[in-house]
Design a protein with these regions (language model features):
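Binding-site signature for planar aromatic cofactors or substrates
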Residues: 1-185
Length: 185
């Protein structure tokens, strides 16, 4: 059965640390809801009501646009092994770019990966745990290295050109992204 909490406790933090992936959901007042899976060693608990995750450049930038427009975010962790458990973190967040105040403080918590474009700084309002009994059991095989390898080998100028269309969401919402933000001068 579902339980709600006002802050992360030690058991929650230990559960999060064991999960190899998590899911991020955001939406603006109008338009599409975005739901994205995330991997890598990219999530950090910064306090009982504060978390952050490192974001790499990819196919879109929906989370950024939605957080600028609305601020709401839900993160979900799921144990695909035993014991079954689902944990949702409800809150608000903001994108922090390399040129922003606060970048250095947040970046110090991570090994910055090639292609890092921002860190999402999230304040948690509530936490919900539920049984997860309807979720299948699966084993972790390995992290996919494709995205990091791509960014290691990418030509910065080509990346800037390719990323120019990612300064808006698929619904046309603006982000704070710039050519400099994507690695240009």
């Amino acid at each position: 059965m579902a339980e709600f909490f006002d802050a992360l406790n030690d058991d929650h933090i230990a559960f999060i640390a064991k999960q190899p992936m998590f899911f991020v959901a955001t939406a603006a007042a109008d338009g599409r809801i975005n739901l994205s899976p995330k991997g890598y060693d990219a999530f950090r608990v910064l306090g009982p009501n504060r978390v952050a995750y490192l974001d790499l450049g990819g196919s879109g930038n929906e989370t950024h646009a939605h957080l600028v427009a609305d601020g709401r975010i839900t993160l979900m962790f799921n144990n695909f092994a035993n014991p079954a458990l689902i944990m949702r973190l409800y809150g608000s967040g903001k994108p922090v770019l390399p040129q922003d105040d606060g970048w250095e403080e947040l970046a110090a918590h991570f090994d910055i990966l090639p292609g890092t474009r921002q860190i999402f700084d999230i304040t948690i309002d509530s936490i919900q745990t539920s049984c997860g009994w309807g979720v299948p059991q699966m084993d972790m095989k390995a992290e996919r290295e494709t995205l990091v390898k791509y960014h290691r080998q990418a030509d910065p100028e080509a990346w800037v050109a390719k990323s120019a269309g990612r300064v808006k969401s698929i619904d046309g919402l603006p982000t704070r992204a710039t050519d400099r933000y994507f690695g240009g001068q």
